[in-house]
Curated annotation (Swiss-Prot):
Segments passing through the bilayer: none
Gene name of this polypeptide: ispD
Cross-referenced Gene3D superfamilies: Spore Coat Polysaccharide Biosynthesis Protein SpsA, Chain A
Protein name as it appears in the record: 2-C-methyl-D-erythritol 4-phosphate cytidylyltransferase
Catalysed reactions listed for this entry: 2-C-methyl-D-erythritol 4-phosphate + CTP + H(+) = 4-CDP-2-C-methyl-D-erythritol + diphosphate
Length: 231
């Protein structure tokens, strides 16, 4: 049985603009309970004792990151990201220690907690190939056609919402992600790059409040979750 990885870093792809929020600034810099969404995300990662470094991939025209109080943290390193999430993650992987494992976490998931990080790190003993956080699907799932008509009810058994962080050995993730992008594969998260390479990642049940802020209504929900966690 494998042991817990000795060296762990975190990667935060933060080069996106979040157009679905309809905001004038990238969504990761919107204010949420007195600081930015990205600030909450970084606070959780930077304060975790097992994470040695946090690498943030930024848009080359980013003018907001340097204003964050977390920007000068000793454990933080910024790199230039790419057009797509996968490009940003790959950029960060190029400066990551090759003997480390990487926790890749969405910039716009500010409600992450240390307990879920601990569970994912500990899962390396059971899933030496890597694993992701997930939440079991609770609702009835429907498939529709182009006209918006229901064509099928999908069995939700063994269906999961993929969350982040996603946790993989740096060297393996870098190679598989690079190869997948070179082949023109559609890569939506790190697990999909590993799956493309024939690897079956593990899945670890995480908290359902680890939501991604994508639409305006998500801000209110994230605010409630953060306030509840602080009590």
């Amino acid at each position: 049985m494998s042991q817990t990885p000795k060296h762990i870093i975190s990667i935060v792809p933060a080069a996106g603009i979040g157009s679905r929020m309809g905001a004038e600034i990238p969504k990761q810099y919107l204010q949420l309970n007195e600081q930015s969404i990205l600030g909450h995300t970084l606070d959780c990662l930077l304060s975790h004792p097992s994470i040695e470094k946090v690498i943030v991939a930024l848009n080359p025209e980013d003018e907001f990151f340097a204003r964050l109080p977390q920007a000068q943290h000793a454990k933080l390193q910024a790199v230039i990201g790419g057009k797509e999430r996968a490009d940003s993650v790959l950029s960060a992987l190029t400066v990551a220690p090759t003997d480390a494992w990487a926790l890749v976490h969405d910039a716009a998931r500010p409600c992450l907690n240390h307990q879920d990080i601990d569970k994912l790190i500990e899962s390396a003993s059971s899933f030496p190939q890597g694993a992701i956080l997930g939440a079991p699907v609770r609702d009835t799932m429907k498939r529709s056609n182009a006209q918006g008509l229901i064509t099928e009810t999908v069995c939700r058994e063994k269906l999961w919402h993929a969350l982040t962080p996603q946790f993989f050995p740096v060297q393996n993730l870098k190679q598989n992600l690079s190869n997948a992008l070179a082949a023109g594969a559609l890569i939506t998260d790190e697990a999909s790059a590993m799956e493309w390479a024939g690897v079956a990642p593990g899945i670890v049940a995480g908290r359902a409040d680890n939501i991604k802020v994508t639409h305006p209504d998500d801000l209110q929900l994230a605010s409630l979750f953060l306030k509840s966690a602080a009590q």
